[in-house]
Amino acid sequence: MRLNHIALAVVVSGAAVATTANAARDTIQIAGSSTVLPYASIVAEEFGKTFPQFKAPVVGSGGSSGGLKQFCNGVGDNTIDIANSSRKIKATELAACKKAGVNQVIEIKIGYDGIVFASNASKAAYKLRPQHVYAALAAQLPSNGKMVANPYTRWNQIDKSLPNEPITLVIPASNHGTREVFQEKMVDAGCETYAAIKAMNKDAQKKACSTFRKDGKVIEIAGDYTETLARLKTSPSAVGVFGLGFYDQNRDKLRVATVNNVAPSEKTILNGSYPVSRPLFFYVKGEHLKSIKGLKEYTEYFISKKVSGKGSKLERAGLISMSDKERAAVLANFKAGKAVK
């Protein structure tokens, strides 16, 4: 079963979540990460079947940043109950939450995921390193003591070991948590391999590492991974950025790249040898636990071993499950009402 076809009845756009909240406060409202979206959609559908006394939650997307922004809008019927996120909540977001009266932000880790680079299945495999990715997308690169416009148009110009294909990188836009992990673990890591950039002051370094070319070779996707996949269909030479779970469900269409000679897998992500991985989360609004029907039950159901552990439906859909010890700690913190400080 394809992730993008699962539980469509409970998936809505991020914009719709806030507008329908007043009309359906016997229904849990969720928005956020495109990476977490398919997993949350599966759980929402199964939750509705398992607990007929509660309505199936309404799951929206909008990206991690978009979901957390909605989450931190305040407390009450017109605000969402859960924000899905492919990264930890930032201090600035937590401050925004508290300013709006959301003081009980409870973090729920659900498992792990890798960020993968994949091309059309009919194309040659890529063996990428962070410096390759940075050299492909940077607006400017150091040359003879100064920064010049990126001269590279084909991958093999960067490194002869790479395919002789035109450079087109399809990456998540800034509203996605995936973008932040991609920036930190691939782009920044690649940028830092240039001695000339490391010698710059911090502001100049940041600009050099985060300013991408605007000549059509870098395409930013604000939507979910299905949109990235569609771009690869129309641009067969493109390399796209996906979550490992999405790639697992589309192996017939995609060829995954190695990073630092390591292929992404459950084993390489858990042992840390694959460098572009992250934990996945959702955040629960503690102030809503008593007023929103089923919110407590949904949270405990999601992190149960049956739902998201080894051999579960979520693992089969691509989620890398936590250890029993981690799961027990997450559940204990939730039951104790432990909020993010």
Region locations from a protein language model:
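Gram-negative bacterial Sec-dependent N-terminal signal peptides
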Residues: 1-22
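Flexible loop/hinge segments at secondary-structure junctions
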Residues: 23-341
